[in-house]
Swiss-Prot record:
SMART domains: zf-AD (SM00868), ZnF_C2H2 (SM00355)
Additional remark text: Piragua means small boat in Spanish and refers to the small number of mutant embryos that have a hole in the dorsal aspect of the cuticle and thus resemble such a vessel.
Alphabetized UniProt keyword annotations: Metal-binding, Repeat, Zinc, Zinc-finger
Native species: Drosophila melanogaster
Gene Ontology MF term list: DNA-binding transcription factor activity, RNA polymerase II-specific; RNA polymerase II cis-regulatory region sequence-specific DNA binding; zinc ion binding
Xref: InterPro entries: C2H2-ZF_Transcription_Reg, Znf_AD, Znf_C2H2_sf, Znf_C2H2_type
Ranges where the ZAD domain occurs: 15-94
Summary of the function given for this chain in its UniProt record: May be involved in transcriptional regulation. The function of this protein is unclear. According to one report, it is required for development and viability since mutants display defects in several developmental morphogenetic processes including dorsal closure and head involution, and die by the first instar larval stage. It may also be involved in fwe-mediated cellular competition. However, according to another report, it is not required for development or viability since mutants have no visible phenotype and are fertile.
Region (Disordered): 132-178
Pfam families found in the cross-reference section: zf-AD, zf-C2H2, zf-C2H2_6
Protein name according to UniProt: Zinc finger protein piragua
Consequences of knocking out this gene: No visible phenotype. No effect on cuticle pigmentation, bristle and hair distribution and size, shape of tergites and sternites, size and constitution of eyes and wings, or fertility and survival of males and females.
Amino acid sequence: MHTSDISMTQDQDVSTCRLCHHNTDPNSLNIFDDTVQFCKDVSIAEVSKSLWSVQYDRNECLSELICSRCLEILEEAFELRKGMQEREQSLQEQLKEMIKDHPKHRPGLNGNPGVFVPEEGCIIVEVDPENLAESSEEEFALGSDGEYENYDDDDEEEEEDYDEEDEEDGQNGEDVDMPLGMDAAQMAAQQSVANNANTTEARPKRAFLCQYCDLGFTLPAECQEHELAAHDPNAPYCCNFCNIKLVTRPALISHIKTLHDPDRPYVCAHCRKGFVRRSDLKKHTIVHTGVRPFTCNVCSKSFSRNTNLTKHMRIHSGVKPFVCQQCPRSFQTAVEMMRHTRSHGEVKAFQCGRCPYSFSRRDKLIAHQQVHTRRDMEQQQQMGLIPPMEGDLQQQALQAKQKAAAQTKNSRYYHCDVCDRTFQRERDLQRHQALHMDSLFACKTCNQGFNRREQLQRHELEAHGPSFTCGICCISFLHQIELENHLKVHQLQHKMAQRAQEAAILPLKMAEKAPVAMTAPLVQDPQLVRPSAAELSFYSNMIPTMNLGFYSETRPEE
């Protein structure tokens, strides 16, 4: 083919429509340079690509024009797509309005669909999407002014939960002591890949909490089934102390603070442990579900919180980021550093009776006194006053003396006689000592043993059910103290009914005693207010069903 023929063919191709390859008119538009009215600021080539996914490349040998027929088809397709998107968006908004009040689709903490509506007092924290780790206490403290005033107590509770995770469930990985000269990477290489995979697959990955009682589940279906079956849609919030049902969460918290526990109104549904804030209760509930998504890559031990994993990793790395401002000592956790800082300003009130040394803490004094005891025993053995003792017997003698000194009156610190751990409360020491025993708490029904009181209570509730029943409303409870608290509500209702009857009868008695010609209005006692007809009907129907003899306050005649 000659050059003139190639030029003729090229001119003919350039003058045709790029979309349909038909001839174009002189008023045709350029698909790369021109824009249309129905889609401004976007070229025709980009509109065609978004509709039909066809990429048009610019080349001097190819046409850049579009005919009027293809332009009309392009406009119709664009308007059709735009209308479909608007109609679908409108349907989705109508669907949200229809299902937002249904219990199954209420927004909550368990992954239910719906529009998130923050509750009263809710703290919204912006989180980096690339670092979706669990927030620490310090991050939440920045968003509230008065909620985190007791910082020391919060840290101690967080440290206590960390110890509870570390002690209660240690089968994920054994405690590994890092040899000298070996870093974390070499230690991780020695771990078994198969054991790590089995441990990761055995544990659930996520916890789902009930939006009404914060009960934890590992499956969303179980959580939704619990919300529909265990909670009344009209009054879904139930008190864990007296089983009274309320409509809103603020009403429930006000009820608990007024009648039951003003300091810790948020109660765990598993073990009845109380918390100051609901965020602490949520973190504690995850421990009961067994969900531990944060795993140590050195010893394969897993944790339910990222903050606890960070503290645990400092054991392997040896990093102590918290440094005392008054001395060169450093610590792995903020709780240890704060406890040490208090020792600088405190008066050393614990004086050793055998030397001039004094200490600010009782446990330090006890550890110091053990040095004197050990020296006395060595001197007596050298002088032949007592026979030499075995190493285990000496250790047992020191542990017995330590335990006796720790449990004296007004003692603030309690020591474990097995592993030398120290606790500030005696109940924490008892709960820790249960881990060293086979079974400390036994079920009275089936004699099954448990290491913790919370496990025994959970077993009694799930296996045997409640055993104390109210004789008035037939509500059952697991413990007698719960029944007694519940009966106080009936007693209060009974007193209110008596006052209502007295207020209704008093005007009639006063009218009978007054003269007939007396026209002055009757003056009632301001403390006795006449109830409405609905209240009188309610109390009159309720009083015959009550066991009034149980609430009788009259003493028998002598």
